[in-house]
Amino acid sequence: MIGVASGLAREGFKVFVTSFAPFLSMRASEQVRMNLGYMRHNVNLIALGSGVTMGYLGNSHYGLEDLAIMRAIPGINISSPSDCAELKKVLHDLTNQNRGPTYVRLTGIPGSRTVYSKDYNYKFGKFEPLTKGRKILVFSTGSVTSEALSAITELNSVGHSIKLINLHTLRPLDKNVLKEIKSF
């Protein structure tokens, strides 16, 4: 599947491949490493069920290591949208830009809470502060961001000062985040 996708990308097609996270990251890792990481073929991988969201299908569908595996392969962008609205923005961006090979890690399940409205202004590679705070800095990625936002909003309402940043793009890393960390 990755070989065919790479060939299509080499011929100029905009290519999206979707499968469960462990199959894209582990079973196809050599092809991903060679064709996407080293040869930089512009293929977008959409990984379903990262983490334990597909646990009801058994441990063969757990995508626990996918992020570590993809981060070990040079040259691959990594996105982890927090909700469906953000996923829509990510896919729109990948359809309209040539970002190079990209791994989109989907961690949500049907019925997951939303973080963003549909008019949210997504920017690839730029971290998104979701709350204001000056004492504690929290980073979140993927569908757990909605839970973090809910908890931090409640804590801030009773006097805490917590800033939550959504890490929707895990590679490339937004260099401004280092300034955020230094300021805390």
Can you name each region flagged by the protein language model?
Residues E147-I165:
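Short helix-loop-beta junction
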Residues P110-G111, V144-S146, T169-P172:
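Short, catalytically relevant binding-site loops at active-site mouths
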Residues A21, G49, G142-V144, H168:
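Residue-level signal for short, function-critical loop segments
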Residues S29-E30, A148-L149, K175:
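Conserved strand-to-helix beginnings and helix N-cap segments that scaffold or border functional pockets
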Residues H168-F184:
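Glycine-rich, anion-gripping cofactor-binding loops and their flanking helix/strand elements
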Residues K135-T145:
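Gly/Ser-rich, acidic/histidine-flanked active-site/gating loops
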Residues G7-L137, I162:
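Conserved thiamine diphosphate
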Residues M1-G7:
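Active-site-flanking structural segment that lines cofactor/substrate pockets
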